[in-house]
Each structure stands twice: as structure tokens, then as C-alpha cells.
Design a protein with these regions (language model features):
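Glycine-rich FAD pyrophosphate-binding loop
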Residues: 23-44
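Dinucleotide-binding Rossmann-like beta1-alpha1 core, especially the glycine-rich loop
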Residues: 47-132, 250
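Flavin (primarily FAD) binding-site architecture
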Residues: 201-216
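Conserved beta-strand-loop-beta-strand element in the redox core of flavoprotein oxidoreductases
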Residues: 180-194, 199
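C-terminal catalytic lobe of FAD-dependent flavoproteins
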Residues: 219-228, 234-236, 243-260, 267-366
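Flavin (FAD/FMN) cofactor-binding and adjacent substrate-gating region
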Residues: 91-168, 173, 180, 256, ...
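Beta1/beta-strand and adjacent pyrophosphate-binding region of the FAD-binding site
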Residues: 2-14
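Short hydrophobic core segments
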Residues: 9, 195-204
Length: 366
């Protein structure tokens, strides 16, 4: 729609990929980011483009299939910022999910990823597992099941996407917070009111907060869940998934010439500064010590990262269990404002396409 000017609020991966879809459809796009592009949750992920093996246990097969297709899309961009790697799930006698269940899950994952050209999952002996993951806890170890996924440099890949858009004409305004928006397409920023043909609210964990401070009702609420990771000086060749007693999983992954360990799950207030608590750091160190020897020392921690994951729930259901809550996204249209709620890094392109569909409806294209 040549001449139609769309504002995208939020410079994380969802905002960037919403702008990508809108530019593809011929809109003029201005993107507003309060801080730096790809500077918040989008650079504090588990550094994976993945379908989410654990979601198969919850029966979310369609969501996993979509994410695996998007994983392939990102790989096919040929950026050099994403690459396949092998992930091991150690099997212990009397602990965690049984081996047959894990093997069945990885075989289904293979099936859903058909066409990706990644190697298939496999069962490994105890000796092979110990060679793949140096220092892994040996007591009760039976072996492992491995599957393939894709690791990425989230910040660099997100910035790559933004740079492609800037070359195509995206107007990008960093360091410019939006204080208020209106359903007629107006934005208030830097003491001025600007008018657009439509507005995309892609502010991640802060999306419903922005609506509330703008006086715009929304039937959905976002629960902010802080996920923290440790980047540590323990180079890894292959990844490992640690099963926890409460059913959660923690990743131990190769990242550059280091390793990344995470994530935690802690309810958070999006109005507070986003940083890992000492309790979360201690939790991750303790998890590593239970699974790998020698235990991590404090001086091996290179960086502590934290980001907020937005979990979508109906208003009045704020007490939902975030461990089993869906990571699927929703788009909500109110007048000329389209709000993107929830979603995952891997599926940001699809989320952007859903946003663009809503903008088309606002602008009379469909």
C-alpha cells in the first residue's frame, strides 16, 4: 500500500520482523525503540532457533512444526550467524523421563522437521555420551539420546535483519520511547504527537502495559517471566539438556568459544529493571554442579544475562502456571492499533506476517 505510513513500536525481533513483513507489502514503516535495537529480551535468549522439543509433551505439535519450518527459513538466509548442532539428553537410571519417551519425542521431532536436511536423532552408549559432554555426572548414567537443532547469535542475527530493512528504507528511531498511543493512529513521543495510518505495538513484555497507560482496553494480560542465563568459560562441542526434578529442562550449550547455561523461570514485574537475581545465579550454579564436574567457579562466569518472556493469559487468570503456559502469539486489533502478544524468537517472521495481515485489514487491503 504505497503511501500508507505504519509505525512499529518496539525494536526487538518481533518489531523487526513485523517491519520486514510490512515493507514486503509496500508500506512505509517507521520503527521506534526506547533503547537499542535487539537490546533487551531478544539478545538474552537461549541462543537457539528451535521447535521446542518439550512442547511435544504438551501436545502442541502444530506449534512445533511451525517453529521447525521457521528454523529452516533462518538457516536458509545464509548469514553465518546460525548453525546446526547436536543436543544430548542424558539418561539416568531411575531419574527423569524414561528413555523410550525421550526417544519417541526425538523421532517425532525428526518427522516434523522433514526437509530440514539436518541429521536424525540417535541413541548413544554411556561411553559415547561421556566423550561428547566432558565431566558429565557418571553415577547411574545409561547413555543419551541426541537430536539436532540450530544455535544462533541472537543479537547479531536480529541486527542483521534490521540492517536489511534499513537498506530497504526502514526509518529507524532508537532511543525514542513512546509514552502513549491512540486508537486513531497517533503516537506521543519526545513531547510531540505524530499521526500514522496504523500502529503496531510490538513491545514484547511491555505490550499490555503500554496499552494500559494509553487507556486502551485489552482482554488479555501478559505475565512477565524472567529467564536468566550464565555465559561461562567452559567451551563445549555439543549441547546437553539437563532434566530437573520439577519437570523443567535446563540447557547447557556451546556459544562462541564458551558455553551458555539456562534458563531460570521467575515471575517478574516488567516495570522493574531486568537483571538476574542472586538466587537465580545460585540456582544455575547448583544445577551445573549436580550434572557436571568440576563445579563451575564464580570466576568462570563471563556474563549473566536476563530477559523477560511474555506469557499470554486471559485477564483474571494471572495465577496460571507459567511452566506449562503456551508460547503461542496473539494479535489484537483496537481501532488502528495492532498489538502483538507473546511469541518466540524462532517464529518471529510468522508473527510479523500475522501483524501485516491485520494492518492490511485496517488499511482496506482485504
Amino acid at each position: 500500500m504505497e503511501g500508507r505510513h505504519i509505525a512499529v513500536i518496539g525494536g526487538g525481533i518481533n518489531g523487526v520482523m513485523s517491519a520486514w513483513a510490512l515493507l514486503d507489502r509496500g508500506y512505509r514503516v517507521s520503527l521506534f525503540e526506547a533503547g537499542q535495537l535487539i537490546g533487551a529480551t531478544s539478545r538474552a535468549s537461549s541462543k537457539m532457533l528451535h521447535g521446542g522439543l518439550r512442547y511435544l509433551e504438551q501436545g502442541r505439535i502444530g506449534m512445533v512444526r511451525e517453529a521447525l519450518l521457521e528454523r529452516r527459513w533462518w538457516l536458509e538466509r545464509g548469514t553465518g550467524l546460525a548453525a546446526p548442532f547436536r543436543m544430548h539428553i542424558p539418561l539416568y537410571r531411575g531419574k527423569g523421563r524414561p528413555g523410550w519417551m525421550i526417544r519417541a519425542g526425538t523421532l517425532l521431532y525428526d518427522l516434523l522437521a522433514l526437509g530440514s536436511k539436518l541429521p536424525r536423532s540417535a541413541r548413544h552408549s554411556r561411553d559415547h555420551t561421556l566423550a561428547a559432554i566432558p565431566g558429565l555426572q557418571e553415577q547411574g548414567l545409561l547413555g543419551s539420546v541426541s537430536y539436532w537443532d540450530v544455535r544462533m547469535d541472537d543479537e547479531a542475527l536480529g541486527r542483521w535483519a534490521a540492517e536489511q530493512l534499513i537498506r530497504r528504507g526502514l526509518q529507524c528511531h532508537s532511543g525514542l520511547p513512546i509514552l502513549r498511543l491512540a486508537t486513531n493512529g497517533e503516537l506521543e513521543c519526545a513531547g510531540k504527537v505524530r499521526k500514522f495510518d496504523a500502529v503496531v505495538n510490538a513491545t514484547g513484555p511491555w505490550a499490555t502495559q503500554l496499552l494500559e497507560q494509553s487507556g486502551i482496553a485489552c482482554p488479555w494480560k501478559l505475565l512477565a517471566v524472567r529467564g536468566s542465563h550464565l555465559v561461562v568459560a567452559r567451551p563445549l562441542r555439543e549441547g546437553c539438556l539437563f532434566q530437573q526434578d520439577d519437570g523443567r529442562v535446563v540447557f547447557y550449550l556451546p556459544f562462541r568459544n564458551l558455553a551458555i547455561l539456562g534458563t531460570t523461570e521467575a515471575r517478574a514485574d516488567p516495570r522493574d529493571p531486568v537483571c538476574a537475581s542472586e538466587t537465580e545465579v545460585e540456582e544455575l550454579l547448583a544445577i551445573h554442579a549436580r550434572h557436571v564436574r568440576p563445579a563451575l567457579r564464580r570466576d568462570e562466569i563471563v556474563e549473566v544475562m536476563a530477559g523477560l518472556r511474555p506469557i499470554v493469559v486471559p485477564r483474571g487468570k494471572e495465577g496460571a502456571d507459567t511452566r506449562t503456559a503456551s508460547r503461542e502469539s496473539l494479535t489484537v486489533r483496537t481501532g488502528k492499533v495492532v498489538t502483538l502478544l507473546g511469541g518466540k524468537w524462532t517464529t518471529a517472521r510468522q508473527q510479523g506476517l500475522s501483524v501485516a495481515d491485520e494492518i492490511d485489514r485496517i488499511c482496506g487491503r482485504t
